[in-house]
Structure formats: structure tokens, C-alpha cells
């Protein structure tokens, strides 16, 4: 079972457990809702044995909010950089993660959220070996992200979301050994909400 299949299994598990618990009475004003978002992402990537590089791309999310303060989020991101270290090679990072999202502040017009996502990341890129020669390759390993942000409602269905995360991924260093990366991601997204939520200030 490869990493992607494990992520799919984990994602279904995250959905099924809250649904099973949802058989208890639902209180007025906390009806479940779903959100789909897509937007621009900026990723500052730590390349082992080298300096950091900037990637730009797209981030797509799907959230199921089972309660007023709690939900599950699925996150799929793709970011890319061109002519990395002036080598004419590109680098990209594909992430696929899921996990819980919490809303410490949730109002009719805006909300504040925190999240912890777990899944995988496949990075393709370039590095230099000990002799200074160019080395290219890819790594697909476990990844996780932790962060938060704010979401402002424009209409009853559309919102704007601003978020930032610390992201942990992996890539090879100058000795061709796999090493952890400390990355920072920020994103701005347009979000569409399915279902009504009667929030009060």
C-alpha cells in the first residue's frame, strides 16, 4: 500500500468517525455545513544543504464542519519554482493532507481557525552533491502542516480565507540523504459554503 492509498484510507476514517458520532441530537443553529475553496498559495521551501527557494501555486480545500467549533479539512496543494539556483531546472511540491480544523472564534461575518493536517508530499527538484555537480530527483514521504487563519464572509455563500502554515516535508541533501524541511506556506482562497449556518455575533 503506497503513501497515497494510506492517505485516502486516513481521509475516509476522518469522515466516518464524526458521522457515526453525529447520531446524537443536533442543537438548533449548529447544522453541519461543507466548504470548498481554491486560491493562490506561496511556499517558502527549505532546500537541504542550500538556501531557501520561493514557490507559487494553487491550493484547493474541502471542509466538512460537523459542529460549530470543529470540522475536517482535506487539502491538496501544488507549488512550483522555475530555474532553481540558476540551473534551468524547476522544482515543485505536491501535497495531499487531511485533518481536524478548530474554530476558537466563529461569528456571522468572520471566523478564526486553527488546523493540523497529516498526509504526504512529493517534491521534485534539484540539489548539488559534495563535488558541486547538479543532482536532480524526487522524494515522496509523510508530511504534516500546522497553522491557522481567518475567514471573512462576503455573502451567504462566498467567503475569503487568509491562512498560513508551518509545513514539514522531506528532500535529499548534498550527500543524497533524505533530510527534513522546515517550510512556510501562506494562501488566500475564495470559499463557497454548502448548507446554511445560523451564526450569531
Question: Which role does the model predict for each range below?
Answer:
Residues 8-18:
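Bacterial N-terminal signal peptides
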Residues 152-201:
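Predominantly the C-terminal beta-signal and adjacent terminal strand-loop region
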Amino acid at each position: 500500500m503506497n503513501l497515497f492509498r494510506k492517505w485516502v484510507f486516513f481521509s475516509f476514517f476522518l469522515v466516518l468517525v464524526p458521522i457515526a458520532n453525529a447520531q446524537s441530537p443536533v442543537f438548533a443553529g449548529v447544522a453541519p455545513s461543507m466548504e470548498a475553496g481554491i486560491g493562490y498559495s506561496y511556499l517558502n521551501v527549505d532546500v537541504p544543504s542550500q538556501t531557501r527557494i520561493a514557490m507559487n501555486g494553487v491550493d484547493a480545500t474541502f471542509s466538512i464542519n460537523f459542529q460549530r467549533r470543529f470540522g475536517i479539512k482535506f487539502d491538496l496543494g501544488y507549488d512550483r519554482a522555475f530555474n532553481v539556483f540558476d540551473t534551468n531546472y524547476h522544482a515543485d511540491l505536491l501535497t495531499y493532507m487531511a485533518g481536524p480544523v478548530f474554530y476558537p472564534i466563529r461569528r456571522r461575518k468572520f471566523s478564526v481557525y486553527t488546523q493540523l493536517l497529516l498526509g504526504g508530499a512529493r517534491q521534485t527538484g534539484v540539489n548539488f552533491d559534495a563535488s558541486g555537480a547538479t543532482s536532480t530527483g524526487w522524494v515522496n514521504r509523510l508530511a504534516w502542516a500546522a497553522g491557522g487563519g481567518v475567514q471573512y464572509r462576503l455573502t451567504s455563500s462566498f467567503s475569503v480565507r487568509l491562512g498560513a502554515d508551518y509545513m514539514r516535508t522531506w528532500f535529499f541533501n548534498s550527500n543524497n540523504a533524505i533530510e527534513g524541511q522546515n517550510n512556510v506556506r501562506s494562501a488566500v482562497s475564495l470559499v463557497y459554503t454548502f448548507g446554511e449556518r445560523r451564526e450569531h455575533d
